[in-house]
Amino acid sequence: MNTASSMGDHATIGRYETFSYLPPLNREEILEQILYILDNGWNASLEHEHPDRAFEYYWPMWKMPFFGEQDPNVILTEIESCRRSYPDHHVRLVGYDTYAQSKGHSFLVHRAR
């Protein structure tokens, strides 16, 4: 009888933010989450960090936050640019709620290998 989980070894794999127990999101699913961030009126931003330092609270920001950006394809293009520039880093998309002054949404869009 095989009792191995199809999700892998949950005890040794680092978990980060929303969706961490799901398989990696594809391009369309990431686009849906970008639309969710924009539909809520939040400002999107990208952060990246090397896996060795991924559990530190602050991650370096990729460029500037996308203040007022309403085109999800612009954000998706920046995600791809960040992935190419830092292939050995985790990349996280953040939706910042300026009214509550906190993160409204945050998840990994790229997990380093």
From Swiss-Prot:
SMART domains: RuBisCO_small. It holds the Pfam family RuBisCO_small. GO terms for biological process: reductive pentose-phosphate cycle. CDD domains: RuBisCO_small. Transmembrane segments: none annotated. The keyword Kinase does not apply. Keywords: Calvin cycle, Carbon dioxide fixation, Photosynthesis. Belongs to the RuBisCO small chain family. Heterohexadecamer of 8 large and 8 small subunits. PANTHER family: RIBULOSE BISPHOSPHATE CARBOXYLASE SMALL CHAIN 1, CHLOROPLASTIC (PTHR31262). The basic functional RuBisCO is composed of a large chain homodimer in a 'head-to-tail' conformation. In form I RuBisCO this homodimer is arranged in a barrel-like tetramer with the small subunits forming a tetrameric 'cap' on each end of the 'barrel'. This is Ribulose bisphosphate carboxylase small subunit 2. It comes from Allochromatium vinosum (strain ATCC 17899 / DSM 180 / NBRC 103801 / NCIMB 10441 / D). The gene is cbbS2.
